[in-house]
């Protein structure tokens, strides 16, 4: 059970902290606000009652306003039910609708103080009608039990049992015993629901002090054990005036009892399952008696000024006046946080990746999709774990949408083939929607491309022949380039550049793309216009790369283009006059050390070797 000090000290003092932390009364429609209110047979001022109900929605004294999720009303007669429903509907914020849960009464109950009625927000809850029960509590009265199920949640722990009761009034041992009997009947029913059930005991319990046996029976051990958000200490006297709920009036008139604010008759008592800050749970510091500023002990709530909203006296006084006119009780309110909603989306890795590529990842974006303010939504812990082609395990706390945390899972690229894996995003949070989300991943790991100068073997160097006529037209030589070994598990290949530097050679077409099973090619041109008969070699460097995917590699092959030139002059007949003689010798010597026509062996330099070749061809 919680320490009483935590809540007594945490009430009005905590308001300022909540106002700051919750961003100054921002709307928070997803939180579950619960109101317990004795409407005194609907004999009070109807307009004032409607305005009090509206104030229950608008109340931001603990940091945020939220349309009420559950109203539990006491002293409802069959004849007044339609008027109460009209008041609930008239006070509802735009866009929100309320449904009447199962309503039961009897002639004896209806002729006495009336029954209990629950109205719930249809966007938050549905009622499981079979979960309703009437529980006899004495004095011709029944307590009611309703089972409400949260919309958008599948977990059984997102269900809320609400007990509504109006126990026997007045002092005296006989009346106390009857109240005790009523509490014991509710506890017996709640205990039978099993462990861990989320339950609220609400209503006008008519307890006169904190030592009354009926009050204490709520805290007995068992599945339905309750705790008091205000602590179990005394609520008597001026120092506890802020806890009181009856009577907001100092006069008895028109069916409404006076006496001033000096009793705590109205309660919302949660069970332990709502005390763990996990899933559906009470938000600390939000339990309050609406309009009770703690300064009206034993007098009317609207006597003088009311300071329930310290910075807005007019608002406080208007609320106090309406409370005075509406009934002879004031509403008790508590706010509950809602369970988390796990949301995980995948940013998939590339569909194809080169083997042994580094830095390849899948990303998982994790968020808590439950709408509302952080204070009203269960903070969601998560784990994201990779399996198969993915690896790594990462933990964190998810922000509310639209924000998200990004978890990066490495992709293993060591093994070629179609690889699969799973990113599993889980949360241990109680009653969380989608507690486990499995995100499948598929990625194909491919070998690097493999340039080859042959389509039948892996060849990195080869001679490609060609023929030309001295002084004739240019000759184009096509060099085929294959992606050797290509299949679905190998990268396609691009030819990115072709380089040739030998005299009389040039590149005509030096690039190609997406070479797979069909070879590509480059084209090199030889111009024989100024050459003589002979053999001319040119190294051609062909550079390649993989397709543009992670891990892309580069490679190269070298083809030697060998052109055989026929016709025209002999190689040593430099002036082409039909005779190798002194004139040719003079031309060769004039070109000494250069790369010119006197380079008879095509080694790039006119030197002694070329001189020897010329002399051997003399005449």
Predicted features along the sequence, with ranges:
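Bacterial N-terminal signal peptides
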Residues: 13-25
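Surface-exposed loop/turn positions
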Residues: 69, 197, 330, 357-358, ...
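Bacterial N-terminal signal peptides that target proteins for export
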Residues: 2-16
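Alpha-helical segments with a strong preference for the paired helices of cellulosomal dockerin domains
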Residues: 82-87, 574-595, 603-619
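Feature for long, exposed domains in two main contexts
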Residues: 338-568
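Divalent cation-coordinating acidic motifs and surrounding scaffolds
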Residues: 30-340
């Amino acid at each position: 059970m919680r320490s009483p000090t935590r809540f007594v000290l945490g009430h009005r003092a905590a308001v300022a902290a909540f106002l700051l932390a919750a961003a100054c009364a921002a709307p928070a429609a997803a939180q579950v606000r619960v109101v317990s209110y004795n409407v005194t047979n609907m004999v009070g001022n109807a307009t004032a009652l409607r305005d009090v109900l509206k104030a229950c929605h608008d109340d931001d004294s603990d940091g945020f306003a939220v349309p009420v999720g559950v109203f539990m009303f006491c002293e409802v007669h069959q004849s007044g039910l339609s008027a109460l429903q009209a008041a609930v509907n008239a006070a509802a914020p735009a866009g929100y609708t309320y449904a009447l849960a199962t309503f039961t009464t009897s002639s004896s109950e209806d002729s006495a103080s009336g029954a209990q009625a629950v109205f719930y927000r249809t966007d938050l809850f549905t009622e499981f009608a079979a979960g309703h029960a009437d529980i006899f509590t004495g004095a011709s009265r029944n307590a009611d039990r309703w089972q409400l199920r949260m919309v958008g949640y599948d977990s059984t722990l997102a269900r809320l049992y609400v007990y509504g009761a109006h126990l026997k009034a007045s002092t005296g041992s006989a009346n106390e015993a009857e109240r005790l009997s009523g509490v014991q009947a509710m506890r017996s029913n709640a205990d039978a629901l099993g462990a861990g059930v989320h339950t609220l005991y609400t209503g006008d319990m008519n307890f006169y002090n904190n030592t009354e046996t009926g009050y204490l029976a709520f805290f007995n051990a068992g599945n339905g054990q309750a705790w008091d958000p205000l602590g179990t200490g005394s609520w008597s006297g001026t120092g506890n005036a802020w806890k009181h709920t009856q009577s907001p009036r100092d006069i008895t008139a028109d069916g409404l009892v006076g006496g001033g604010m000096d009793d705590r008759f109205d309660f919302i008592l949660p069970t332990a399952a709502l005390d763990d800050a996990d899933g559906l749970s009470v938000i600390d510091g939000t339990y309050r008696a609406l309009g009770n500023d703690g300064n009206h002990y034993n007098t009317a709530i609207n006597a003088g000024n009311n300071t329930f909203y310290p910075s807005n006296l007019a608002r406080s006084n208007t609320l106090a006046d309406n409370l005075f006119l509406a009934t002879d009780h004031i509403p008790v309110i508590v706010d509950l946080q809602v369970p988390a909603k796990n949301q995980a989306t995948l940013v998939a890795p590339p569909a194809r990746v080169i083997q042994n590529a580094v830095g390849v990842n899948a990303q998982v974006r994790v968020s808590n999709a439950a709408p509302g303010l952080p204070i009203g939504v269960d903070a969601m812990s998560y784990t994201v774990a990779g399996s198969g082609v993915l690896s790594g395990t990462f933990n964190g706390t998810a922000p509310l949408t639209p924000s998200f945390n990004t978890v990066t899972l490495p992709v293993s690229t060591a093994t070629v083939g179609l690889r699969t894996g799973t990113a599993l995003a889980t949360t241990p949070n109680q009653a969380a929607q989608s507690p486990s989300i499995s995100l499948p991943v598929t990625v194909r790991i491919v070998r690097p491309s493999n340039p080859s100068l042959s389509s039948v073997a892996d060849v990195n160097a080869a001679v490609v022949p060609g023929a030309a006529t001295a002084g004739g037209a240019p000759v184009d030589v096509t060099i085929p380039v294959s992606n050797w070994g290509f299949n679905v598990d190998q990268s396609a290949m691009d030819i990115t550049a072709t380089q040739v530097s030998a005299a009389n050679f040039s590149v005509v077409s030096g690039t190609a793309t997406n070479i797979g099973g069909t070879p590509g090619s480059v084209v090199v041109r030889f111009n024989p216009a100024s050459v003589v008969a002979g053999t001319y070699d040119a190294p051609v460097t062909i550079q390649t790369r993989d397709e543009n995917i992670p891990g892309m590699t580069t490679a190269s092959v070298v083809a030697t283009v060998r052109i055989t030139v026929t016709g025209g002059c002999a190689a040593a007949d430099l002036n082409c006059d039909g005779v190798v003689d002194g004139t040719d010798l003079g031309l060769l010597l004039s070109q000494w050390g250069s790369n010119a026509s006197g380079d008879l062996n095509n080694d790039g330099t006119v030197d002694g070797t070329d001189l020897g070749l010329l002399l051997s061809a003399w005449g």
